[in-house]
Amino acid sequence: MRKHKHTHRGAAISFVFFSLLFFLLFGRFVYLQATGVADGQVLAVEAQKRYLKKQTLEAKRGTIFDRDGEIIAEDIPSYTIAAILDPNMPQHVTDPEETARKLAPLLNMNVADVERILKKKANQVEFGPNGRGISQTLKQKIEELKLPGITFVRDSKRFYPNGTFASYVVGYAQKDEATNRVEGKMGIEKQFDEQLKEKDGEIKYESDPKGFKLPYADEQIVPPQNGKNVYLTIDKHIQTFLEDAMNAVEKQYEPKKIIAIVADPKTGAILAMSTRPSFDPNKRNIENYFNDAISYPYEPGSTMKIFTLAAAVNEGVFQPNETYQSGSYQVGPHRIRDHNKVGWGQITFLEGVQRSSNVAFAKIVREKLGEDRFLQYLHRFHFNEPTGIELPGEKTGNILYRYPIEKVTTGFGQGTSVTPIQQIQAATAIANGGKMMKPYVVDRIVDPESGKTVMKHEPTVVDTPISKQTAEKVLDILETVVTSEKGTGRPYQIEGYRVAGKTGTAQIPDPKGGYLTGHQNYIFSFLGMAPRENPRLIMYVAVQQPNISYTETGAAPVSMIFNSVMKSSLQYLNIQPTVEKKRVKKEKSISLPSYVGQSVEQATQSLKNQGLHVTIIGKGTKVRAQFPKAGEHIVAPDRVLLQTDGNAMMPDVTGWSLRDVMKLAELLQLKPSFIGSGYVFRQNITPGAVVKPDDYLIVELAKPSEIDKKQQTNTEQQETDGPVD
């Protein structure tokens, strides 16, 4: 009986215990069913998080183009390598040692380091900096190893195919680790970041526990939004001429700074802008984070005399044949001297302009115009305010006008400071019939999806500081600065073209007080426009503290840039030279007919008979395309490119000028990039190789003396060169 009692009691206890447990579980079940909440977490949401997968649809940052649609900055594919370690995933790393042994050399890492990463207790790992920014080529090499668990995350990086080309204008963009998006940090990339930036889209769908999409699962798609494309006013050809010339001067004279701007005076469009030192936005080896063309105010020197002269002519107080005593001029306790210290005796004011006499301009400001009226013209030319060019970091100069001596010295560019872009803006009034144009670098912004232009820049007249008649008279006077035997601008004569302009030799303030002394311690400059009869280009060049010998003047490095860039640019724009009769035979302008459809042999012979160099591209028998195009003018012995039918084949460009390489790239729709200056001695595409549009063409250039040996080894020529003797 006792045994039965204990048995019944145990059964009762068990019954009660399991009944309570059942009711607790049932209550919990009812609660979960009713509320859907467990431990503060909404179960439906947690389930959705676990089985709802999200895939990013990558958008593309806007592309930056030059005025003709040549790419200057673009997004290109790059990849981050990752390893899946989760054994529950169908594809995961199964042999860390073997994977590390094969992968390490391609990532330029130690085998032990890779193996350590692959043995981490994590579901997925990456390989640090060596595993990011991987190119398509390297990705393919890794994929060929067929390593289980090794995968790639597609990304993009900003690429600048031309390296240092207009780098302070374009700037650069890079990924911000905090926001995981590319952000503009300098130049156009920064100024137009809102327009250029992209917005990634995404796809959401339900998956099984292994991550595979469930059959018939709905997709939620948010489409990506690509950034807008920005078209600059920069002309790739003119910018290339400028970069090439500046590289040569930098190498030869090792100056502290070089600043140059080329603009269209009719519109204010900036066609080229560059500074030295420069940087490659792909590497970001930046010494100076400011664009000196817009952010470096300094005493301009005698280029400022252009605007003092314009004010005097406009007010009718400049009498070119009136004489004055040059040499020195007293202003209170201060004595102003001409640059040669003694002057040239009694000379006319016209000769004073030609010789860049400080005394002439001191007298114009103080005795002809008057300081108050001169200040009004400084404001009319907007030297008291920034230009508003669409680049970050623009600064304005400082008009020093407190004391009598400052008012007078401002007239010849000393004391008062201005920026190069302010001088360019003011000079448009001289070259554009009195109308001063606002400088700008962005021509238009285009939506890549619709192709619609969302912003178009219209040329803006910011002021009319002088009359059209005054502008013409000033141009006439400035032309004599270049043509007169007494003119300081004689080094800036360009054969076949009339140039008007003014030289500048600006003193550099000494931090200890006063100004630096010495033959080299100046900012040498020239502000010129051509052709005189209808200026199409204005150009400012400044070279600070070049390493010139005592037999050289500051005009040597400045004219080396101005003359070559101005002449090449005028020819490129098909602006006909004013050819003197004695030069007709030497520089005959040739209007090219169309050779398309003709036999290669016939076209080649015709061009060679005109003294032109000819390069044949391809092995066909008929001409399919030519460059320059029909109707364009060239001068013998310029190069003409003839593309034949059939595949386009890369010629040997050894010894070519950068200008000819750019012609080739335009004809074949290649993406050119260059290193160095001078003439080509190395190319990345093998001569004879078939090329396709958008292939990258990289050339290295050097001086002729450096490529002579390489030229001697080239025994096979794939081009037919003229002229015929």
Stretches with model-predicted labels:
Residues A59, P90-E98, R132-Q136, V182, ...:
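Soluble non-cytosolic domains of exported or imported proteins
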Residues E115-A122, P255-T267, S326, L391-K395, ...:
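Acidic/histidine-enriched alpha-helical segments
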Residues G131-L145, T151-G163, S167-Y168, Y172, ...:
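Conserved SxxK-family serine transpeptidase/carboxypeptidase catalytic domain
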